[in-house]
């Protein structure tokens, strides 16, 4: 009888890719294991369709992809942003139940576990109906995971209203961080007084029911955070199995990628600063102009992934930028040293020898990718847990320089503008070998550690072996 794991990823590109690549890793490491991935359609992230098609075009043995029936987007897009994915999975419960029912009726299959993205943990209700063990996948780092559990504990056990931390100078003593953490670096949703924080807190309560939490990180990157969570008897066992990355670039637009990489081929080694802010990383026009002026004044070559703003309620991400957002004459004046694009093949760009620095929103996947390729980072977090990731990269790990950690851009409502002078200064600091050699050295060392972690007998390799012992 074959052993089957069911994976339920959130249909946002970074979340989905991480879980599918993890499924491939599991299969490669255990010959008696198969994985079925259940994918929901999500109207905002168009990159998912391309990635999905690439998976179906190149099937992997023992990996089954099932596309769940589409849900009317009005049933979840009208919810507050933090509730979109929990609402989506609530509407998919019937379909997940049908899949699990068919699988349990098969005499040749034994479901050994259901692994759900942390935003989909309410699906545990369905797993419980079939007495299937449940596991959580955290696409964010262990530091953030520790903060989330800490806030949930403060709220539930200490009766602390965590929304009072909003706009406060409070510093939190979070077990997963060696340094005091400014409370304002918590994801804004945790601090909202309109009840939205309850949605997030409920997810982390539910996480505690799981038999284990699988995290896309590795021991050498977050030793303090990982050890702190393992010492907490109220938190399920932690399994760091990363870095898990989309190294083959499935789902990318090969024609656009070829043009971008061709331009990089013509640039000197380590001469280009790459700016990319994730799927939802867009700026209002006044901030775009400040970035443009800062880049021009820095004198460095640059590759800038610039996306137009997305408004609340929009159902599709826009991948192209408008020249109208840029300062007059900017493209002409910088034509010899720049390339401004919409979508970017981020992994391939970071791997290119022409790139010498990365200005990033500090989404956790981007953090892992920068470490894997030994790329120094200048942090510019925008939303979600990114402020905390930036704090961890700069203050805890010493792997990045800071452009701005206080910037927040929720649907482009930020009134705070980072000025061109500061952008110019920080880009020069990022790209200058002299003043920044310590960070470059640490990043290169962590690059080697990340690869050792995934190799035989490495920390993540061993952690996955322990997980298999638990599951099988």
Curated annotation (Swiss-Prot):
Keyword Glycosyltransferase among UniProt keywords: yes
Keyword vocabulary terms for this entry: Glycosyltransferase, Isoprene biosynthesis, Transferase
Known catalytic reactions: (20S)-ginsenoside F1 + UDP-alpha-D-glucose = (20S)-ginsenoside Rg1 + UDP + H(+)
Result, substituting residue 186 to L: Gained ability to transfer a glucose residue to the C6-OH of protopanaxatriol (PPT)
Chain positions recorded as an anthocyanidin binding sites: 15, 384
Entry's Gene Ontology BP terms: terpenoid biosynthetic process
Residues that bind UDP-alpha-D-glucose: 344, 346, 361, 364-366, 369, 385-386
GO molecular function, one term: UDP-glucosyltransferase activity
Pathway(s) per entry: Secondary metabolite biosynthesis; terpenoid biosynthesis
PANTHER family recorded: GLYCOSYLTRANSFERASE
Function noted in UniProt: Probable component of the triterpene saponins (e.g. ginsenosides) biosynthetic pathway. No detectable activity toward protopanaxatriol (PPT).
The protein's name: UDP-glucosyltransferase 103
Gene that produces this protein: UGT103
């Amino acid at each position: 009888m074959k052993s089957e794991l069911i994976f339920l990823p959130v249909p946002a590109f970074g979340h989905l890719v991480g879980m599918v690549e993890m499924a491939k890793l599991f299969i490669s490491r255990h010959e008696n294991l198969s994985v079925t991935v259940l994918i929901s359609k999500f109207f905002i992230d168009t990159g998912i369709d391309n990635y999905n098609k690439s998976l179906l075009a190149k099937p992997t043995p023992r990996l089954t992809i099932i596309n769940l029936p589409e849900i009317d987007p009005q049933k979840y897009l009208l919810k507050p942003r933090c509730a979109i994915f929990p609402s989506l999975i609530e509407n998919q419960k019937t379909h997940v139940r049908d899949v699990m029912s068919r699988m349990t009726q098969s005499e040749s299959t034994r479901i050994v576990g259901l692994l759900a993205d942390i935003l989909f943990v309410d699906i545990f209700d369905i797993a419980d109906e079939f007495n299937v063990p449940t596991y959580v996948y955290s696409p964010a780092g262990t530091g953030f995971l520790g903060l989330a559990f800490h806030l949930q504990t403060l709220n539930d056990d200490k009766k602390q209203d965590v929304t009072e931390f909003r706009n406060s100078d409070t510093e939190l003593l979070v077990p997963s961080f060696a340094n005091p953490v400014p409370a304002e670096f918590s994801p804004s949703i945790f601090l909202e007084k309109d009840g939205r924080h309850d949605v997030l807190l409920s997810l982390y309560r539910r996480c505690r029911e799981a038999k284990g939490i699988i995290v896309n990180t590795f021991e050498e990157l977050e030793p303090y955070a990982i050890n702190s969570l393992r010492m907490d008897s109220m938190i399920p066992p932690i399994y760091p199995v990363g870095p898990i990355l989309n190294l083959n670039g499935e789902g990318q637009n090969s024609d656009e990628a070829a043009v971008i990489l061709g331009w990089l081929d013509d640039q000197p080694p380590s001469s280009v600063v790459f700016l990319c802010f994730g799927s939802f990383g867009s700026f209002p026009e006044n901030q775009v102009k400040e970035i443009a002026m800062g880049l021009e004044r820095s004198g460095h070559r640059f590759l800038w992934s610039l996306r137009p703003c997305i408004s609340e309620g929009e159902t599709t991400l826009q991948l192209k930028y408008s020249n109208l957002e840029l300062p007059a004459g900017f493209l002409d004046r910088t034509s010899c040293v720049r390339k401004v694009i919409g979508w970017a093949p981020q992994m391939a760009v970071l791997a290119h020898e022409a790139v010498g620095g990365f200005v990033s929103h500090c989404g956790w996947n981007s953090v892992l990718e920068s470490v894997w390729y030994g790329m120094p980072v200048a942090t510019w977090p925008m939303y979600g847990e990114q402020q905390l990731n930036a704090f961890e990269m700069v203050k805890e790990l010493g792997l990045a320089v800071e452009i701005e950690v206080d910037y927040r851009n929720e649907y482009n409502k930020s009134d705070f503008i980072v000025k061109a002078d500061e952008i110019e200064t920080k880009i020069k600091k990022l790209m200058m070998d002299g003043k920044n050699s310590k960070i470059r050295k640490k990043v290169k060392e962590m690059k080697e550690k990340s690869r050792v972690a995934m190799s035989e007998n490495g920390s993540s390799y061993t952690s996955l072996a322990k997980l298999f012992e638990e599951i099988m």
